[in-house]
Curated annotation (Swiss-Prot):
Reactions performed catalytically: N-terminal N-formyl-L-methionyl-[peptide] + H2O = N-terminal L-methionyl-[peptide] + formate
Name recorded for this polypeptide: Peptide deformylase
Source organism superkingdom: Bacteria
This enzyme's EC code(s): 3.5.1.88
Cofactor(s) needed for function: Fe(2+)
Naturally occurring in which organism (per UniProt): Desulforudis audaxviator (strain MP104C)
Xref: NCBIfam families: pept_deformyl, PRK00150.1-3
GO terms (BP aspect): co-translational protein modification; translation
Length: 154
């Protein structure tokens, strides 16, 4: 559909709590497609609506097979397993990286584009990506959670 410019930190929308989606409309469906297109074109593995300037609780995360998972009003319902510290970056904070501690297993729940409630048990890097994108919906960027922040050449 369309590729949007990624909102750059410290834009205020990245610090706002995104609004809940009350109804899945054609506008929300277009938003989901645009998130997927923008994520792929930008070389990301996840993207949240506030990152393209839209204050809605919608995210997309690629699964391990590179298929996009779109979730509306996502929430983490269970964190499990060990915590692991690993490098994270963000399309909204280009050229900056940090070491962030996250749980390596979680259950996330939300709604798909058909309006059905769905849940996913995810592990490893995918679990990290879901936590990162859901943080965006709550006005949190990875810099807030990083124990070390650094720049590196792309």
């Amino acid at each position: 559909m369309a590729v949007f410019q990624i909102v750059q930190y410290p834009d205020p929308i990245l610090r706002e709590k995104a609004r809940e989606v009350r109804k899945i409309t054609p506008q929300i469906e277009r938003l989901a497609v645009n998130l997927v297109d923008t994520m792929r074109r930008s070389g990301g593995v996840g993207l949240a609506a506030p990152q393209i300037g839209v204050s809605k609780r919608v995210i997309v995360v690629e699964d391990p097979e590179k298929n996009p998972i779109v979730l509306i009003n996502p929430e983490i319902v269970r964190l499990e397993g060990d915590k692991e510290t690993a490098e994270e970056g963000c399309l909204s904070v280009p050229g900056v990286w940090g070491q962030v501690e996250r749980r390596m297993c979680l259950t996330v729940r939300g709604y798909n584009l058909e309006g059905k409630q769905v849940a996913y048990l995810v592990e490893g890097f995918t679990a990290r990506a879901f936590q990162h994108e859901i943080d965006h919906l709550d006005g949190i960027v990875f810099l807030d959670r990083a124990t070390t922040i650094y720049k590196r050449k792309e």
